[in-house]
Design a protein with these regions (language model features):
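Bulky hydrophobic/aromatic packing residues
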Residues: 1, 7, 24, 31, ...
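Catalytic adenosine-cofactor/nucleotide-binding cores of aminoacyl-tRNA synthetases and other
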Residues: 59, 64, 167-168, 178-257
Length: 257
């Protein structure tokens, strides 16, 4: 299945989703279900947000990133990334901030909850959950909220993703608990890196499919190179979808052990 995570429309480039789907098709990857587009599913996220609100688990926050950094770096600042500046505002303070015309973000009242979860690569994990944002000041729903709603709605049982998201998992587990959602199993794998050992990123002009095409590298060879990069075949080997699925399942079992 394919999910287009495009909630922050201010940062999404027009045509980027279509280009990604085209690139996947060119290297022979197909999907069995209709493509899920998060920007078309905001009603589901709004329902989840209202459930949190009904449990008094949300509060308005007007803090800027600069203010949060300054408060957290103070001698007696909070140990977590958000210092709680807006958590217990009085009625008068709330009225003053609302009158300013600035739109607030919405944060959860996590109360420093300790969350434990198991990762099949990294083992047992324990994290303190911060009061993280679930709705941004621009009105966009945050990734943490959308992803747990979508995972549950799509009956996702296993999440396999880059280990840059390992630290985000506790917040998602906390949301799953509050919303009564099923927790999937997690596998966080090392990120794909370039020949300079830097994380592959469009921001850093990493290798693209179009760039490979200009170098006369076929889509089939790009597919083979990608599969070889995670140790599922030799670079010169061409494997079909059935072989790929079988070997991918095997490497997850090896990662777990």
């Amino acid at each position: 299945m394919i999910r287009i995570e495009d909630l922050d429309l201010e940062r999404c480039r027009a045509g980027s989703a279509e280009q990604q789907l085209s690139d996947l098709a060119k290297i022979g990857l197909e999907w069995d279900q209709p493509v899920i587009v998060q920007s078309e599913r905001t009603a589901l996220y709004a329902l989840a947000l209202e459930r949190l609100r009904s449990e008094d688990l949300l509060y308005e926050c007007w803090c800027t990133r600069a203010e949060i950094r300054e408060a957290s770096s103070a001698p007696h600042g909070a140990p977590t990334s958000y210092p709680g500046s807006c958590r217990e505002l009085s009625s008068a303070q709330l009225a003053q901030r609302r009158a300013s015309g600035r739109r607030p973000a919405l944060r959860v009242r996590a109360e420093g909850a300790e969350i434990e979860f198991f990762d099949r690569v990294h083992g047992e994990q324990k994290r303190t959950v911060d009061d993280f944002v679930v709705a941004r000041q621009n009105g966009a729903f945050a990734y943490h909220l959308a992803v747990v709603v979508d995972d549950n709605d799509q009956s996702i049982e296993e999440v396999v993703r880059g280990d840059d998201l390992l630290d985000s998992t506790a917040a998602q587990c906390w949301l799953q608990e509050q919303l009564g959602l099923v927790r999937p199993s997690y596998v966080h794998l090392p990120l794909l890196r370039d020949d300079q050992a830097l994380r592959m990123s469009k921001r850093d002009s990493s290798v693209t499919l179009d760039g490979q095409r200009q170098l006369a590298v076929s889509a089939a060879q790009v597919r083979s190179n990608l599969i070889a990069s995670i140790g599922l075949c030799d670079a010169a080997e061409m494997i079909n979808d059935e072989q790929l699925l079988s070997r991918f399942s095997s490497i997850l079992v090896e990662s777990a052990s």
